[in-house]
């Protein structure tokens, strides 16, 4: 309690002291000034949105505008404004994490128009409120984690709440707006976003152009520490690289040389602390005529750490690292998390140990990148969804050639393509991939999700520079017909903040293998750049370039310190296998926390990693939206925190695929989505003493 300046005004001081103590007992304001956290770098941008022309959730587009397949237009495509870039970023990021088709559930089970009870009552769903935007940095000017707080007009300062929405993947700061931000805003909570220090930061090396915090562009030299990301190259190194490798791009997650995943938990905690500052700034009274006081202190606000994929992993890491009670509870979907497993931990299915669990992403992603193109050729996977812009004949040739090269290298067995493909698939099973995800192995590689992740994370885990061209890969613009590196007709940089996802290929910037002048990695060699894929794999298997140490640095201990928590994941996840992520985390948690644990786990059959793929033929008939259960989990946690309702126990949720004709599946109904049960019976998942047992 600050008594400075009271002087001899004893009576007034005593009265103020009494009021202060009463306020403190009720979590209210004190005479202390609200101080911007020390990690906030530069100024804070504050913008109010009226909920009509522009808003927090839809950027003025509403439910209808978000559903449009066409991105909002820029008045001048070469120089979009910050407001235009924000609108496109919200449009693209919202759509990236949910099924946007009406038959698939948009506008009926979720969407801006759907209230928290699942009813279509909110019209276009625009939400008025205020945004606070700033960087978090360590003083170097190179971290520059983007922090964003949205405070809806419906926020009740007497019943405060915060929901974190750490970006998924390597997305920009709006990267979890549909996954977690939307629920928080509808609940009347402040939403604390951050981009995890990856944040879709791009640099066009040839022009030395970078993005700023709002997506607008600047010369890297002039931007200085205001840049979202600038590669750590001298002017001489940059010129030499551009001479040898023109039309190339650097991306923050891959090329910051900081292993940003190490700080994802910290960034999430910082976003919560920044949200506290914003709420005090908005709702605390003035203490001296010009400065706001402190109404909320750490632990005063109900705070749910939420998000999906990488954002989910960040939320778990934050809860583990939390020493000041910033976080009350955790709700995450399909978390990408690297768990430090105890020797006695085990994952079982109906009593039988699975062949592999708890591997880090650096291991399973580089293995999948090597084997998936071959495994996809297996006749047992006939009818798998096709998710590539390449002609089918080209893709089939890639698969055959990858199998042949793997066989020649002694990495698969078999005298013909089918036997080689069967062996590749068997190796994936032995590495912990479930048969439930078999029909997605092709899609994960054909869509370039796995190659993109393997290259980006290998760069991050080795702290490689863009100039290193790790394993002979780079990011470049290419000729649409041939795949060869080429100058673009127009730079992709003006739109990269709005349309990019931070992991090339994205926004017109592709993943290339540096054969000759460089070619799209799928087309650079008949076996789709096998040599590069093998190199990435060997970085892990041979422990090269400090990769093991940097991976060890991102591992977590699965100790949530007694916080109530829910994890949701689809059993068919082929990007982040459930054996290595959620199941492994729950098993280790039962050691790390033991009887203190309040973690429950819901495994969704027929659920996979990318709900945005569900409208695609073959996805629509086979898979259900995991997002639906993420929302249910948030509602369950809210009731648990606010009314003491017990969380339903860990369980398998046995969903029903829509079926029908690929590309024309019948509309999703509640019959496809059974509720999370309070008494799961034979579907209960058991966890304890280092073991998790999941019923098949």
Curated annotation (Swiss-Prot):
This is D-(-)-3-hydroxybutyrate oligomer hydrolase. GO terms for molecular function: hydroxybutyrate-dimer hydrolase activity. It comes from the Bacteria. The active site is at 309 (charge relay system). Residues 1-26 form the signal peptide. It is found in: Secreted. Its main location: secreted. GO terms for cellular component: extracellular space. Its EC number is 3.1.1.22. It catalyses: (3R)-hydroxybutanoate dimer + H2O = 2 (R)-3-hydroxybutanoate + H(+). Pathway: Lipid metabolism; butanoate metabolism. Participates in the degradation of poly-3-hydroxybutyrate (PHB). It works downstream of poly(3-hydroxybutyrate) depolymerase, hydrolyzing D(-)-3-hydroxybutyrate oligomers of various length (3HB-oligomers) into 3HB-monomers. Keywords: Hydrolase, Secreted, Signal. InterPro entries: OHBut_olig_hydro_put (IPR016582). Pfam families: 3HBOH. Belongs to the D-(-)-3-hydroxybutyrate oligomer hydrolase family. GO terms for biological process: butyrate metabolic process. It is an enzyme of class 3 (hydrolase). It comes from Burkholderia vietnamiensis (strain G4 / LMG 22486).
């Amino acid at each position: 309690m600050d008594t400075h300046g009271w002087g001899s005004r004893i009576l007034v001081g005593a009265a103020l002291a009494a009021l202060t103590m009463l306020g403190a007992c009720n979590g209210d304001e004190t005479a202390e000034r609200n101080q911007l956290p020390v990690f906030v770098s530069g100024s804070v941008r504050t913008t109010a949105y009226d909920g009509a022309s522009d808003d927090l959730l839809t950027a003025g587009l509403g439910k209808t505008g978000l559903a449009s397949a066409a991105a909002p237009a820029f008045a001048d495509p070469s120089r979009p404004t910050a407001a235009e870039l924000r609108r496109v970023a919200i449009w693209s990021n919202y759509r990236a994490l949910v099924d946007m088709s009406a038959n698939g559930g948009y506008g009926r089970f979720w969407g801006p128009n759907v209230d928290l009870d699942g009813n279509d009552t909110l019209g276009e769903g625009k939400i008025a409120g205020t945004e606070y935007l700033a960087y978090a940095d360590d003083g170097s000017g190179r971290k520059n984690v983007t922090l964003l707080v949205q405070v809806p007009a419906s926020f009740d300062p007497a019943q405060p709440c915060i929901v974190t929405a750490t970006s998924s993947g390597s997305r920009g700061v709006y990267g979890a707006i549909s996954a977690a931000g939307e629920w928080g805003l509808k609940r009347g909570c402040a939403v604390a976003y951050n981009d995890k220090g990856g944040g879709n930061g791009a640099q066009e090396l040839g022009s030395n152009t970078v993005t700023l915090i709002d997506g607008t562009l600047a010369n890297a030299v002039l931007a200085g520490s205001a840049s979202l990301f600038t590669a750590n190259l001298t002017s001489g190194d940059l010129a030499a690289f551009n001479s040898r490798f023109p039309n190339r791009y650097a991306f923050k997650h891959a090329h910051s040389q900081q292993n940003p995943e190490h700080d994802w938990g910290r960034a999430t905690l910082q976003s919560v602390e920044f949200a506290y500052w914003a709420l005090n700034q908005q709702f605390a009274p003035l203490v001296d005529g010009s400065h706001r006081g402190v109404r909320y202190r750490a632990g005063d606000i109900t705070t749910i750490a939420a998000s999906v994929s990488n954002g989910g992993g960040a939320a778990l890491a934050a809860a583990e690292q939390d020493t000041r009670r910033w976080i009350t509870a955790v709700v995450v979907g399909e978390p990408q998390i690297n768990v430090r497993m105890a020797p006695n931990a085990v994952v079982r299915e109906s009593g039988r140990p699975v062949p592999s669990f708890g591997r880090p992403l650096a291991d399973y992603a580089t293995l999948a990148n090597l084997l998936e193109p071959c495994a996809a050729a297996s006749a047992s996977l006939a009818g798998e969804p096709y998710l590539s812009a390449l002609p089918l004949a080209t893709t089939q040739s890639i698969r055959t050639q990858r199998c042949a090269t793997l066989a020649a290298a002694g990495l698969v067995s078999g005298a013909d393509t089918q036997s080689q493909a069967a062996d590749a698939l068997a190796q994936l099973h032995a590495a912990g991939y479930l048969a439930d995800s078999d029909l997605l192995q092709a899609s994960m590689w054909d869509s370039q999700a796995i190659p993109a992740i393997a290259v980006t994370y290998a760069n991050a885990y080795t702290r490689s520079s863009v100039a290193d061209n790790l394993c002979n890969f780079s990011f470049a613009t290419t000729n649409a017909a041939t795949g060869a590196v080429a100058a673009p007709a127009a730079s992709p940089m003006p739109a990269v903040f709005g349309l990019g996802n931070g992991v090339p290929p994205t926004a017109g910037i592709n993943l290339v293998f540096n054969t000759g002048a460089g070619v799209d990695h799928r087309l650079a060699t008949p076996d789709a750049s096998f040599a590069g894929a093998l190199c990435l794999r060997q970085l892990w298997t041979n422990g090269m370039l400090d990769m093991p140490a940097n991976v060890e640095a991102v591992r977590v201990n699965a100790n949530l310190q007694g916080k109530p928590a829910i994890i949701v994941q689809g059993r068919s996840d082929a990007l982040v296998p459930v054996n290595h992520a959620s199941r492994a985390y729950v098993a280790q948690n039962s050691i790390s926390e033991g009887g203190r644990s309040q973690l429950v786990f819901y495994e969704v059959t027929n659920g996979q990693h990318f709900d945005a793929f569900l409208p695609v033929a073959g996805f629509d008939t086979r898979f259900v939206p995991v997002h639906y259960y993420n929302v249910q989990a948030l509602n369950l946690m809210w009731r648990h925190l606010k009314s003491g309702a017990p969380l339903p126990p860990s369980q398998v949720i046995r969903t029903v695929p829509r079926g029908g004709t690929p590309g024309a599946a019948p509309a999703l109904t509640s019959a496809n989505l059974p509720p999370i049960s309070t008494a799961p019976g034979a579907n209960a998942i058991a966890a304890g003493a280092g073991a998790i047992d999941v019923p098949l």
